[in-house]
């Protein structure tokens, strides 16, 4: 799988917070995917842990979130999806939360309002951001394997069309850092789920592959490739889908990974449209 143009940057008031951005997404849209660098948390959450659910010091997490928002160039409130590992999409409107961070029970958030910042927490699952240059709508989605086979990203495409009149061919989608096929080993029950979700897709070859180590009853799955297939099936142009190639599980120096460490921090992907 190729990448269309992810680039690491040093940005924001802290000056030392690396972000990953896609060249597909241009102003007035802003977005970014965090790494584990640039924060204040102590091990095993070192250093830019953005999730408060797994045991880190709350004040450290709050400082890390402020640093991320400054680096991306946005302000609160920050609306984040409290993932349910499905395909639930929720629309967010300006004023739904007065300040701070607002958690919504969903796997994806969409908005048509400028100045509304959407985000998702991950630690191996795919953080996806979607922008529509024609309507100005944006979305942030969490796509783990369950959300992938449930069709969370096609559900986002449909929701953007229903709520804002978005056309799939106008959308630009960026898939941030996530577990790669090198490390995502699964059993036959998960393989069957992917085979069902991708049935009839002519370009699904290479999504599921035998264990490279020859482990009986085990396969490896390429989550990003699976979501490319599903997005293309939903009408998104293949050259409007960007995907970071790095694996969160393999690259311990740069990324948190639940599969690798269990006790770990969380990364974020965030997106917004700046007011005119």
Q: How would you describe each model-predicted region?
A:
Residues 1-276:
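Active-site microenvironment for binding and transforming phosphate-containing groups
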């Amino acid at each position: 799988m190729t990448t269309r143009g992810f680039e690491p940057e040093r940005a924001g008031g802290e000056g030392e917070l690396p972000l990953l951005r896609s060249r597909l997404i241009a102003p007035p849209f802003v977005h970014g995917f965090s790494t584990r660098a640039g924060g204040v948390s102590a091990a095993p959450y070192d250093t830019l842990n953005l999730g408060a659910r797994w045991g880190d010091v709350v004040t450290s997490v709050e400082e890390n979130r402020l640093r991320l928002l400054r680096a991306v160039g946005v302000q609160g409130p920050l609306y984040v999806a409290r993932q349910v590992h499905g395909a639930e999409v929720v629309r967010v409107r300006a004023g739904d939360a007065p300040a701070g961070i607002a958690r919504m029970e969903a796997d994806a958030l969409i908005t048509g309002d400028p100045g509304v910042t959407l985000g998702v927490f991950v630690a191996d699952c795919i953080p996806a951001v979607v922008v529509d240059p024609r309507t100005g709508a944006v979305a942030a989605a969490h796509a783990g394997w369950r959300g992938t086979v449930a069709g969370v990203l096609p559900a986002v495409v449909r929701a953007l069309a229903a709520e804002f009149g978005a056309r799939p061919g106008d959308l630009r989608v960026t898939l941030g850092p996530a577990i790669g096929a090198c490390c995502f080993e699964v059993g036959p029950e998960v393989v069957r789920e992917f085979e069902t979700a991708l049935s009839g897709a002519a370009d699904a070859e290479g999504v599921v592959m035998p264990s490279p180590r020859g482990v009986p009853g085990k396969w490896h799955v390429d989550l990003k490739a699976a979501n490319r297939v599903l997005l293309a099936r939903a009408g998104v142009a293949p050259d409007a889908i960007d995907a970071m190639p790095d694996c969160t599980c393999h690259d311990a120096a740069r990324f948190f990974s639940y599969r690798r460490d269990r006790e770990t921090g969380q990364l974020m992907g965030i997106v917004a449209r700046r007011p005119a």
